[in-house]
A protein has these predicted regions:
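Helix-to-beta-strand junctions that scaffold the AdoMet/dcAdoMet cofactor pocket
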Residues: 110-111, 124-126
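Short amphipathic alpha-helix with an adjacent loop that forms part of the alpha/beta core around
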Residues: 91-95
């Protein structure tokens, strides 16, 4: 992993993605960078590869994602040895093929969650690490659009906003630490460490920054880039203020009173066959898969 502080990751993300993404991804990059992930390493839900390229100094042996366009972009990052269009519920790799698996802000978007967790456990070697991040039940409650109506005596309106935001975020699972611990335990993954990240105040900024960053949607559509002026983080006063805030929020530890949970797991040892060769297909992948 790249060893760097939150300020480094904030600067790097603000140059390439909207503020709301930079807030979350910089905090997550700081946490992921603090965990040793031996190779071979699999990235489940690699997306366009931006996050993997940000946190890894060494190559990532394999990445998978359902979106062919995202996979095509991930290939251009130069960090993945192989990338495939594949489902997390049917990973196209041999049993025990990987020493580590990472998955950043992906599991909450997957309806067949149990199948995906079982597949992650299957391809992970005994004693191997699985590191992931997920939203907690606080995600919707901490949004500014949910907080203000509650303060005004309109709790139903606040709850409706939270449900709407989860829906447009395609969140199927925003569960507690205990729920995740039980899910992981059921597939042979022991939760060995966790940390909450992004406080209530951080989520207010997260919510507001969606609207502040609305012009980036047009930029992405017209020019294929979220940010047209990367150096604005240095020269534009509002961006400098935002950068300082993002560092503060990314470094703070809100404990259980957090919108997101970072999980570090270890696969339990068991009597089993010898590890398979890294990246060896145990089944035929989708016809679209490319490695």
């Amino acid at each position: 992993m790249i060893r760097a502080d939150c300020a480094y990751f904030v600067d790097r993300h603000l140059r390439t993605v909207p503020v709301h993404r930079a807030l979350i991804r910089a905090a997550e990059a700081t946490l992921f960078a603090g965990v040793d992930l031996p190779r071979p390493l699999l990235d489940v839900g690699c997306g366009d590869g931006h996050f993997g390229a940000t946190v890894r100094a060494e190559p990532i042996d394999a990445g998978i994602d359902l979106d062919p366009r995202e996979v095509a972009q991930a290939k251009q990052q130069g960090i993945y040895r192989g990338v495939a269009v594949a489902s997390g519920a049917e990973l196209p790799f041999a049993d025990q093929a990987f020493a580590s698996v990472m998955s950043n802000c992906v599991l909450e978007h997957i309806p067949p969650l149990e199948e995906t967790l079982r597949e992650i456990s299957r391809v992970l070697r005994p004693g191997g690490a699985f590191v992931t991040s997920v939203p907690s039940p606080n995600f919707a409650r901490f949004l500014l659009g949910a907080t203000l109506p509650r303060a005004l005596g309109l709790p139903a309106l606040g709850e409706a906003y939270g449900r709407w935001f989860n829906r447009i975020s395609r969140h199927y699972h925003t569960d507690s630490l205990d729920v995740w611990r039980a899910r992981l335990d059921a597939v042979g993954l022991d939760l060995v460490r966790w940390r909450g990240y992004l406080s209530r105040e951080a989520m207010w900024l997260f919510d507001l920054s969606h609207y502040y960053g609305a012009p980036t949607l047009l930029s992405k559509r017209l020019f294929g880039r979220w940010v047209l002026w990367p150096d604005k983080v240095r020269y534009w006063p509002p961006e400098r203020w935002l950068a300082r805030r993002l560092v503060r929020y990314g470094e703070e530890d809100p404990g259980a009173d957090a919108a997101y949970i970072f999980l570090v797991c270890r696969k339990r040892s068991a009597v089993s066959s010898q590890p398979g060769e890294p990246l060896a297909f145990s089944r035929q992948p989708s016809a679209r898969a490319e490695c």
